[in-house]
Structures are given as structure tokens and as C-alpha cells.
């Protein structure tokens, strides 16, 4: 039974991607989740309970963060088991982190076959972007959702969670009625740059996919 006032609707969300892509920074932005996180020693994981208030009541994502184990190779199956959704993160200033996305995706779907997955390109606040919108095609091949994000500026923080919530609840009209308390931005996302990136993504979306897999 959920405790009094606890959201009845809860989902296990696994957060994966190369070390240094900003996964922990991202999940720590949600202040109550950071305050109430629990450490699971057997798996070496921190679980952050992130609550979002929607027009259909509160939803909790129990976000599993690896605490850096991915630097030592793959993650154990216990991390993925019973995950109901996932975020795969890479760093837009580091091409190798995007090149490794297919490996993370493969590990994930081997254990969790048909779960909704969002791909996030983090650090878009940094001017020296290496992985441009037109080269981000993996999500289109695998039917994932994609968002540019900037954890340190809170840019698009809620987008992956809203998309996952709509998929998991089965309601495309689900909305967040209030934003969670987020840590104050450490950097400011340039609105002109954000607008440019949104346009680039729209243009890329309208372009035919390349046949070869050289871009992965």
C-alpha cells in the first residue's frame, strides 16, 4: 500500500549512458527527489523518487541512477529488471558518447523488451556542440523519442518525463499541472540558441534517413 499522500502511480525508470554525460546532474535537479533518494547497496544504485503533478493526479518516477558503475563496463541485469521506462543519455559535446548509444539500447532491450525510451542529448548549453541534430538518427530507427536537454540550465528538464508519462498512462493529452521544484540554473540557456536547435531538430526530422549505419 502506498503511504498516505503517496502517488499511487509509480514507475521504475532506468537512466543509462556513458559516464560523464550528466545523468546524475540531471536527476539531482529535482529537489524533493534528491532529498528523498535511497541508496541500494547491493546494486550500487541511487533511486530518486521524482514526483510530477499531472491533470490525472500525481505520478512518481523512481529513477535508478548508476552512481558511476558504467565506467567499469556494462551494468548488471538487476539494474534493468522490471524497468518500465528508460532514458538513454549522451553528451552533445562528445561524439563517442553518441556512438555508444546503440550499445546501451541493446543492453536495455535485451532485458526490457517493449518499454518506452527517451534519448536525451545533454549539455546543449555549451556552444561547442559536436553532435548536431542532423546526425542524431538512432531514435528514428528504433522508434524512440528524442530531446535536446541542458541539465545545468533546466532546459527541457520535464520533456522526457512528460513524454514517458503519456506513453505509460496511455493518455496523449496528459499534462503537468505544476512544475516540480528544480535546483536553480547553474548556467543560462541562450534562448536564441535554443530556438535554433529546435528548428534544426524539426528540419532533421523532415529529412530522409540515411541507409548506411556509418552515423552510429
Swiss-Prot record:
Belongs to the small GTPase superfamily. Ran family. Keywords: Cytoplasm, Developmental protein, GTP-binding, Hydrolase, Magnesium, Metal-binding, Nucleotide-binding, Nucleus, Protein transport, Transport. Residues 7-171 form the Small GTPase Ran-type domain. Monomer. Interacts with rangap1, which promotes ran-mediated GTP hydrolysis. Interacts with kpnb1. Interaction with kpnb1 inhibits rangap1-mediated stimulation of GTPase activity. Interacts with rcc1 which promotes the exchange of ran-bound GDP by GTP. Interaction with kpnb1 inhibits rcc1-mediated exchange of ran-bound GDP by GTP. Interacts (GTP-bound form) with tnpo1; the interaction is direct. Interacts (GTP-bound form) with tnpo3; the interaction is direct. Interacts with kpnb1 and with tnpo1; both inhibit ran GTPase activity. Mg(2+) interacts primarily with the phosphate groups of the bound guanine nucleotide. It comes from the Eukaryota. SMART domains: RAB, RAN, RAS, RHO. The keyword Cell inner membrane does not apply. GTP binds at residues 18-25, 36-42, 68, 122-125, 150-152. GO terms for biological process: eye development; GTP metabolic process; mitotic sister chromatid segregation; protein import into nucleus; ribosomal large subunit export from nucleus; ribosomal small subunit export from nucleus; ribosomal subunit export from nucleus; snRNA import into nucleus. Disruption phenotype: Morpholino knockdown results in defects in eye development and reduction of cell density at the neurula stage. Co-knockdown of nemp1a/b and ran elicits reduction of cell density and eye defects more significantly than the individual knockdown of either one. Gene3D superfamilies: P-loop containing nucleotide triphosphate hydrolases. Its cofactor is Mg(2+). It is found in: Nucleus; Nucleus envelope; Cytoplasm, Cytosol; Cytoplasm. Its main location: nucleus. It catalyses: GTP + H2O = GDP + phosphate + H(+). GO terms for molecular function: GTP binding; GTPase activity; magnesium ion binding. Residues 68-84 are annotated as: Switch-II. GTPase involved in nucleocytoplasmic transport, participating both to the import and the export from the nucleus of proteins and RNAs. Switches between a cytoplasmic GDP- and a nuclear GTP-bound state by nucleotide exchange and GTP hydrolysis. Nuclear import receptors such as importin beta bind their substrates only in the absence of GTP-bound RAN and release them upon direct interaction with GTP-bound RAN, while export receptors behave in the opposite way. The lineage of its organism: Eukaryota, Metazoa, Chordata, Craniata, Vertebrata. It comes from Xenopus laevis. Residues 211-216 are annotated as: Interaction with RANBP1. GO terms for cellular component: cytoplasm; cytosol; nuclear envelope; nucleus. The gene is ran. It is an enzyme of class 3 (hydrolase). Residues 37-45 are annotated as: Switch-I. This is GTP-binding nuclear protein Ran.
Amino acid at each position: 500500500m502506498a503511504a498516505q499522500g503517496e502517488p499511487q502511480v509509480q514507475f521504475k525508470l532506468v537512466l543509462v549512458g556513458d559516464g560523464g554525460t550528466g545523468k546524475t546532474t540531471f536527476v539531482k535537479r529535482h529537489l524533493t527527489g534528491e532529498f528523498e533518494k535511497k541508496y541500494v547497496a547491493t546494486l550500487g544504485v541511487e533511486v530518486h523518487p521524482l514526483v510530477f503533478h499531472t491533470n490525472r493526479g500525481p505520478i512518481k518516477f523512481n529513477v535508478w541512477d548508476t552512481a558511476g558503475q558504467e565506467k567499469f563496463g556494462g551494468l548488471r541485469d538487476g539494474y534493468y529488471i522490471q524497468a518500465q521506462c528508460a532514458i538513454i543519455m549522451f553528451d552533445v559535446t562528445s561524439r563517442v558518447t553518441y556512438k555508444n548509444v546503440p550499445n546501451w539500447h541493446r543492453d536495455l532491450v535485451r532485458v526490457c523488451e517493449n518499454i518506452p525510451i527517451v534519448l536525451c542529448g545533454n549539455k546543449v548549453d555549451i556552444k561547442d556542440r559536436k553532435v548536431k541534430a542532423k546526425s542524431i538518427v538512432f531514435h528514428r530507427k528504433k522508434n524512440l523519442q528524442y530531446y535536446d536537454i541542458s541539465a545545468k540550465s533546466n532546459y527541457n528538464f520535464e520533456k522526457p518525463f512528460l513524454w514517458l508519462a503519456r506513453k505509460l498512462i496511455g493518455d496523449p493529452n496528459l499534462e503537468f499541472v505544476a512544475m516540480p521544484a528544480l535546483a536553480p540554473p547553474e548556467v543560462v540557456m541562450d534562448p536564441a540558441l535554443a530556438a535554433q536547435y529546435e528548428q534544426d531538430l524539426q528540419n532533421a526530422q523532415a529529412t530522409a534517413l540515411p541507409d548506411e549505419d556509418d552515423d552510429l
